[in-house]
Amino acid sequence: MRLLLIHSDFIEYEAKKKTKFAEDPCNPADRLDDALVAFCAVESPDADDIDDVICQTVTAIGEMAGKVECNRVMVYPYAHLSSDLAAPDLAVAALKAIEESLEKAGYEVKRAPFGWYKSFSLSCKGHPLSELSRSITPSEDAVKPEKKHIEHKFFVLTPEGTIHDVQEYMDDSPFAALIKKEIGTAVPVGGEPVHVDLMRSKEFVDYEPVSDVGHLRWLPRGKLVRDLLADYALSLVLDYGASPVETPVMYDLADKAIFEHADKFGERQYRFKSGNRNMMLRFAACFGMFTTMRSMHISPNHLPMKMYELSTYSFRHEQKGEVIGLKRLRAFTMPDMHSLCKDLENALTCFEEQLAIGWKTGRDFGTQLVAVFRCTEEFYSEYEGWIKKIVKDSGVPILIETLSDRVHYWIAKIDLAAIDGQNRPIENPTVQIDVESSKRFGIKYHLADGTEVYPPILHCSPTGSVERVFCAILENTVNQKVAHLPTWLTPTQVRIIPVTDNHLGYAKDIAEKLTKARIRADIDDRDDSLNKKIRAAGMDWVSYVIVVGDSEMNSGNLTVTVRSESEPNKPQKITCTAEKLIEMIGKETSGKPFRPLYTPRMLSLKPRYI
């Protein structure tokens, strides 16, 4: 509770305009002379013991009133004292309780209405005790309300439909790593994940020292990968029939639905004031998509309706000690799709389709994914056959977690995860069945008889955040004989190294052919030795390296080192024409997005970024 107490000659107010949280009925205008004005802002931590906070507030007001010998109190809700406000219902209840407690103590009390834009005038008496501010929190020994006890059960379901104890899967596999993390038996591993060094040493991403922790700078090579991953996600959802939108990154907490949805996420939010409005930075794209949906005229014939946004950016105020590399950030890019479904049966069908997309992303990125399916016991009992079907369709065992009761907006969800070099899960694609948000945001359609229907909504990130996808791809390189990216994601797909300056013109001709064929090719024309240039191509993880000299110029045949097929100290080399190489790379990258080089073609023009 934030409290500002002012001993005044008078206070008068007039309610001008309602907000969505407006208290009604109310006293629209009032005045109190020779009064102690108590400006109050009820804060979210007060919910831990609101009765204790009310008691402390009444005591603080009473002590001040006694010192200034004042028997009149105006309780005035004033949200601008805090950027971490409590839920409106709790705030109103607290303010009413303060009013009633003061009246019982013998004070003459008036209370300005909650949730209105109001004009007010007051005249502060100006004596040494006329102004006081207080910050009140629940006492350390306050008894917090007990959380609902939820029982969690874990077991493994196989594609054959059989149920197994999780202990049967305690081996060294990626699936076992997921199980150990979920049931709490994973052994903590020290040190930084592999990708943290790689993201900087390969000049993909760097830290930004003059920004907040967890906000990164993307360098050209990393920006290219990031953009390709975003293009890939867009192509997936367009093929699936989703319609892209773009919505704001910040929202007004005065909107009841926005506040309630944000409040479910707890304290890990960026909140701030914009003028007299309490705002938040989104932690997902659902805020803007849901407000868009509630303003639409939706017919059952439109459903399922799929809406997509590349959330650039979403913000989560993670604990500073938890922020690491690309895995856990405070600002990240989330491909986010929401599907408004006709009914639960329709939602289950869409769930299957979107889960299949999630599995596909693992294959396309070259990262092995494992899965955990979570639902309430009631949902599992009713839809066990359907759950067995999606496990069968997935073709791999899936960890099942059942909850004794629903505590989230979803009744069922699946999380797919890659496993990093330290045997820890990196959660990426997800699909969730949301049965709360349509009601909260007023998203509805009408049946022929006029009945209102608040339909289920699927939340789906087909890839997971772009940063975590890249994290998983980099972590996966520890499992490769020679570290490499999928060719369609490699910043330089082909590097041409002329033996001498006499071969530079021929190298440029090859590079031009490759570029016209939508292949990213550069030329190492620097004044370095041939061996140093070859090592540099390896350090840059170039997919195909061509050294051109007299033999290549005369024959037209190129000797090409293929990184993905090489072994340590044993490069895999093939001989082919430029046309054949173009055909090979075309087949390898078919169906994947393309962007040109983000760095100069001639390496002599490329600066170092780190």
Curated annotation (Swiss-Prot):
E.C. designation(s): 6.1.1.3
Main location class: cytoplasm
Binding site for Zn(2+): 286, 338, 459
GO terms, molecular function: ATP binding; threonine-tRNA ligase activity; tRNA binding; zinc ion binding
Keyword match Phosphoprotein: no
GO cellular component: cytoplasm
Family annotation (Pfam families): HGTP_anticodon, tRNA-synt_2b, tRNA-Thr_ED
Catalytically driven reaction(s): tRNA(Thr) + L-threonine + ATP = L-threonyl-tRNA(Thr) + AMP + diphosphate + H(+)
Cofactor(s) required for function per UniProt: Zn(2+)
Region annotation (Catalytic) ranges: 194-486
Keyword line: Aminoacyl-tRNA synthetase, ATP-binding, Cytoplasm, Ligase, Metal-binding, Nucleotide-binding, Protein biosynthesis, RNA-binding, tRNA-binding, Zinc
Cofactor note: Binds 1 zinc ion per subunit.
Top enzyme class: ligase
Region described as Editing domain: spans on this chain: 1-144
Subcellular localization: Cytoplasm
Family: Belongs to the class-II aminoacyl-tRNA synthetase family.
Subunit structure: Homodimer.
Swiss-Prot/TrEMBL domain comment: The N-terminal domain is an archaea-specific tRNA-editing domain that hydrolyzes incorrectly charged L-seryl-tRNA(Thr). Catalysis of tRNA editing is performed by the charged tRNA itself.
NCBIfam families per UniProt: PRK03991.1, thrS
Protein purpose: Catalyzes the attachment of threonine to tRNA(Thr) in a two-step reaction: L-threonine is first activated by ATP to form Thr-AMP and then transferred to the acceptor end of tRNA(Thr). Also edits incorrectly charged L-seryl-tRNA(Thr).
Protein name: Threonine--tRNA ligase
Source organism (scientific name): Methanospirillum hungatei JF-1 (strain ATCC 27890 / DSM 864 / NBRC 100397 / JF-1)
Organism taxonomic ancestry: Archaea, Methanobacteriati, Methanobacteriota, Stenosarchaea group, Methanomicrobia
